[in-house]
């Protein structure tokens, strides 16, 4: 009798736990396809850490102690139209545009630089906790990656933490999150030393799709650190512009299901 009562008591609890486990299950990400539309020349000495496209021009952050820069680049020719060197002690990282200001991360200092978009004059600084890898602007908050599985959403004036989202797929947390681009409610993200771009839901952190780019042209001979890194979106055409650290080309892609 007692055994029957115990089973009757525990059965609903077990059902609830099973339901909770099933409701937390994440679907395997969709696999995206692409068409290579064009390839443009890219400075093969530029270790790309951040890339964006605005009014037909690239804005690029490059890294390396003593070689970090902020650049304005003509896409089709690869010509650097404007360049600003960072301090020798600085290591440039992610880059985002908000209104008429460019925001550039530094890797380990916890400091970032604000520039005037037109002149590249330094007009301010900002601070954040931990390392800075990738940066994007979603129209309300900055989104920052730091190489972990967590994306931080930051208040634009104070850079205070508003919320965070752990990025997950069907296997669990996904780390090594690097360069970011915000596109229509989704976060497109490079993973360090991975030949793929993740498409992440900005609210839940769930990886909804993966774009495998292992077939793209890259440096020869292969440099182990010349990894895929750099995502820019052209809202006028919907095309994706991608490159990597010290890659000789920027590739323009039409992404499809």
Please provide the spans of the model-predicted regions.
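Signature of short aromatic-glycine-proline-rich micro-motifs recurring in repeat-based ectodomains
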Residues: 48, 177, 224-232
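Conserved beta-strand position repeated across blades of beta-propeller domains
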Residues: 52, 94-96, 136, 181, ...
């Amino acid at each position: 009798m007692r055994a029957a009562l115990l089973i009757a008591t525990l059965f609903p609890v077990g059902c609830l736990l099973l339901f909770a486990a099933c409701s937390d299950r994440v679907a395997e990400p969709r696999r995206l396809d692409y068409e290579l539309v064009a390839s443009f020349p890219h400075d093969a000495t530029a270790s790309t850490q951040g890339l964006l496209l605005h009014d037909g021009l690239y804005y690029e952050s490059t890294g390396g102690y003593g070689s970090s820069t902020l650049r304005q680049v003509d896409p089709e020719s690869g010509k650097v139209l404007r360049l600003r060197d960072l301090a020798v002690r600085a290591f440039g990282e992610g880059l985002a545009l908000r209104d008429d200001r460019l925001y550039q991360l530094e890797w380990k200092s916890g400091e970032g630089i604000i520039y005037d978009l037109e002149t590249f004059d330094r007009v301010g600084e900002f601070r954040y906790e931990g390392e800075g890898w990738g940066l994007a602007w979603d129209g309300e908050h900055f989104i920052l990656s730091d190489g972990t599985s967590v994306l931080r959403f930051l208040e634009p004036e104070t850079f205070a933490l508003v919320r965070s989202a752990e990025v997950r797929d069907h296997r669990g947390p996904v780390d090594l999150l690097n360069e970011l681009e915000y596109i229509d409610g989704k976060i497109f993200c490079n993973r360090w030393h991975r030949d793929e771009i993740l498409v992440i839901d900005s609210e839940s952190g769930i990886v909804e799709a993966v774009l495998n780019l292992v077939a793209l042209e890259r440096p020869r001979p292969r440099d182990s650190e010349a990894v895929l890194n750099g995502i820019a979106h052209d809202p006028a055409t919907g095309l994706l512009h991608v490159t990597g650290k010290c890659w000789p080309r920027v590739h323009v892609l039409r992404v499809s299901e």
